[in-house]
Amino acid sequence: MLFRSGVPDIEGPPTRAQLEGVMGMTAEDLMAKLYPHLSKERHMELFDRCCQVENTYLREHGGVLYPQLEETLEALSQKLPLFIVSNCNAEYIPCFLDAHQLHRYFRDWECIGRTGKQKWENIRLVVERNHLQRPVYVGDTAMDQEAAQKAGVPFLHAAYGFGDVTGAPEITQFPQLLELLQD
């Protein structure tokens, strides 16, 4: 893939632990954390190349899904409108949804790669665009919690994900959403 072809100013691909440590960050923040010795221009050039490789792979192979994800999405979508807000590139969400044929469960989605806006602004944008009355943002990082708070939306911590969060209700398995979001 990208690092197999050689990137002269990078010693090698980031480790799994390093990648997990930057999940949910904006492109600028994650590249600065992974490669502090590179310029901002080089960060974005490298990030764009990584996104191209990632999106191609994702569309063809998909990703690792949480247990009972599709069954839970199907049940939830019959009771509630579902949406996605992410700090990903513009093509990531469509690639992921295409790979797993999950489009039918989501009414709308937004990301920083499409709008250039911060996650909290995109949460607010989706809430306003879809006239949501009682939204809840489910996320797995402190950055998600902060974004939900800034957007004025209640936050539910997905403790099975990548980050640690304090002071928020949590679920430890994806299907628990069915119980919590009943009414």
Task: Please give the residue ranges for each predicted region.
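Conserved phosphate-coupling serine/threonine residues in phosphotransfer and NTP-handling enzymes
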Residues: S86-C88
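Asp-based, Mg2+/Mn2+-dependent phosphohydrolase catalytic module
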Residues: A90, P94-D183
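Metal-dependent phosphoesterase signature
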Residues: A32-E70
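Short, small-residue-biased leader/transition segments that mark boundaries at the very start
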Residues: M1-L2
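Short helix-capping segments at alpha-helix termini
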Residues: V7-G12, S39-E41, Q101-Y105
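Helix-loop "lid/cap" segments that line or gate small-molecule binding pockets
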Residues: S5-V7, T26-K40, F96
